[in-house]
């Protein structure tokens, strides 16, 4: 529920319409235990490879399009202001979120903070962790 509230606030701030909000959030139903929620959050450094799942678009589309096994990817976090490649990873995820085939299945949550981190850590089913070894020791 907290994630939907956060998205609603973001959409109001950006003056986006209710249809866009519904399109993006239509699969975020905390009451539906059948939706597999996969999350990635924290710092968007390139060695963490948050967007690796987006590289094979056809495969990702097959994963998220299975009506019997619905999947939603939630991304949240920030890139260091001087990390231009990390900022580009964020932009790639945001662009993907807005495309018709991935809207509502790939979601980026802005304004990452400790409360959002708590919601994600306690609410996602699988934590996405694809770092380049040995640059990341623990997946933080």
Predicted regions span which residues?
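Catalytic cores of carbohydrate-active enzymes across secretory and cytosolic contexts
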Residues: 1-140
């Amino acid at each position: 529920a907290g994630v939907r509230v956060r998205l609603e606030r973001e959409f109001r701030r950006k003056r986006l319409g209710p249809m866009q909000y519904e399109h993006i959030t239509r699969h975020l139903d905390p009451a539906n235990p059948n939706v597999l929620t996969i999350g990635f959050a924290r710092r968007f450094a390139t060695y963490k490879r948050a967007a690796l799942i987006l590289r094979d678009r056809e495969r990702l589309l097959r994963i998220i399009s299975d009506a019997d096994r619905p999947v939603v990817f939630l991304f949240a976090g920030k890139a260091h202001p001087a990390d231009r490649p990390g900022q580009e990873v964020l932009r790639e995820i945001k662009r993907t979120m807005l495309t018709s085939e991935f809207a509502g299945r790939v979601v980026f949550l802005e304004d990452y903070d400790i409360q959002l981190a708590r919601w994600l850590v306690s609410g996602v089913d699988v934590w996405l962790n694809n770092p380049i070894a040995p640059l990341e020791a623990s997946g933080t």
